Amino acid sequence: VGSVFQNPRTQFFNTDSDSEIAFGLENQGMPTEELRQRVETTAADLEIQSLRNRSLHALSGGEKQKVAFASVYAMNPDIYLLDEPSSNLDIDAIQDLRKHLKLVKQQGKTILIAEHRLYYLMDVVDRIVYMEQGQIAGIYTPEQFRAIEKDERKRMGLRAVNLHEVHPQFTSPGAAENKILKLQDVGLYYKKQAIVEHINLSAGIGEIIGVVGHNGAGKTTLSRTLCGLHKEAS
């Protein structure tokens, strides 16, 4: 059984990506040459060559999630247990995850996924188990699940099964007065390497700002900088 947790940091035993992928294989006593080949194959199958030999501390949340999945995939378990594997992933990385789940399914593996995002799984899963108040309240095929009316799905606390059904309502932005936060030409760094440069941003009292972007774009580093947890800024 291989497990991927919601927070990948809680399952890491090493400080670099290759060592983390190899860790389980080492504990199985796999010969060195076979181990190296398995790590190479894993990186190729999951298309994560760009994450090879990287410090785990330098990776974004989504990149860490990819390494966590790779460390399990390398061990070739019969059963995969995934706890919200898409929680740290951007939309492109979620599509990569979907592709990897299909690959594992084609290999004849059993997969159990606890998840809030539903849309990317609808052509992957065979059964959907709905839980309510600690009990199984329903078991559906994907076709039956898609047929649930929107209002009923909302009552069940479920998200959309098709992103084309999602139509967010936006309000016209006003000129926020009384600025409480201002960034001017700020740069963010990790071990003296630039992550983001020339950030100019201001926020007014009562204003809500969403910081979005691909995995590794610097969203978390910016947030950590604003609350004083990341010191490499200029």
Name each model feature, range by range:
Residues 80-83:
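Catalytic Walker B motif of ABC-type/P-loop ATPase nucleotide-binding domains
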Residues 33-51:
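Conserved ABC ATPase "signature" region
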Residues 55-59, 63:
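Conserved ABC ATPase signature
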Residues 135-157:
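Conserved beta-strand-loop-alpha-helix hinge in the C-terminal portion
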Residues 115-116:
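H-loop/switch region of ABC-family ATPase nucleotide-binding domains
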Residues 69:
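Hydrophobic anchor residue at the start of the ABC signature
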Residues 212-214:
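The feature captures the beta-strand-to-loop junction immediately N-terminal to the Walker
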